[in-house]
Amino acid sequence: MVKKNTFFANKNLGQNFLVDSEVINRIINVINPKSHDFMIEIGPGLGALTYPICKILHKLFVIEHDNNLGTRLLKDISNIEVFVEDVLKFNFLNLINNSFKSVRIIGNLPYNISIPILFYLFKFHNNIIDMNFMFQKEVASKLLAIPGTKSYSRLSIIAQYYCDIDFLFDVVAQSFYPIPKVTSSFVRLVPRKVFNLYVRDINQLSNVTALAFQQRRKIVKNSLSSLFNDDALRKLGIDPLLRAENLSVKQYCLLSNHVC
């Protein structure tokens, strides 16, 4: 197990530190970092992944909101660059453009902001090779959900539009300190280089899905009544009596293009 030292988790930052060496080794194996990889780690915490990865890479970039943790890593590791910043305000393009390479991103994401982080990273999808993240299992289920299931959500649609997504494995709560109340899942997201669905304006896809899932059990003729009448829905091949959770990613793309 990784030593917890004298650091205490900051609940406001959603910190749950990975401390299980078996899980850490498994993550390193599935990420399979190469010495030349341009890699960014979000939320390194106590350095459970940071230390072993830095033994492989020429250099690792990390984004850590907690100044104490960031300073500790900088003191201990020579081939690391630490940005003590809020990841939701971090300009990834500056770093990417300066390196002239596409990036791999890894992290044990803070549970309380994992979804906002993901939506923020989608903005940089053209410059990302893959993202390997630890999520709360409930979030992982939403990422992978198919239409008609309880977990299917706006997150499912946006994430599946942008990425190919693979579930890698679950991680029990006892692998973290402090022990969370939930199981976690390690997931890989690979941004598409060629989109298999056409979306004219991603903002419209975001707006349509947000509107539809405000009340997911409503039929779409009601939840989307401000945008579409029955005839418009039928012309797009969509049954007005279906609920938001029953429409496919492709159908949401059609709806968003019709609004543009």
UniProtKB/Swiss-Prot annotation:
Protein name in the entry: Ribosomal RNA small subunit methyltransferase A
Enzyme class: transferase
Keywords: Cytoplasm, Methyltransferase, RNA-binding, rRNA processing, S-adenosyl-L-methionine, Transferase
Cellular component, GO, one term: cytosol
Disulfide bonds: none
Catalysed reactions, as listed in the record: adenosine(1518)/adenosine(1519) in 16S rRNA + 4 S-adenosyl-L-methionine = N(6)-dimethyladenosine(1518)/N(6)-dimethyladenosine(1519) in 16S rRNA + 4 S-adenosyl-L-homocysteine + 4 H(+)
Protein localization: Cytoplasm
NCBIfam families per UniProt: ksgA
A UniProt-annotated Pfam family: RrnaAD
Residue sites binding S-adenosyl-L-methionine per the record: N16, L18, G43, E64, D86, N108
Record-level Gene Ontology MF annotations: 16S rRNA (adenine(1518)-N(6)/adenine(1519)-N(6))-dimethyltransferase activity; RNA binding
Lineage: Bacteria, Pseudomonadati, Pseudomonadota, Gammaproteobacteria, Enterobacterales
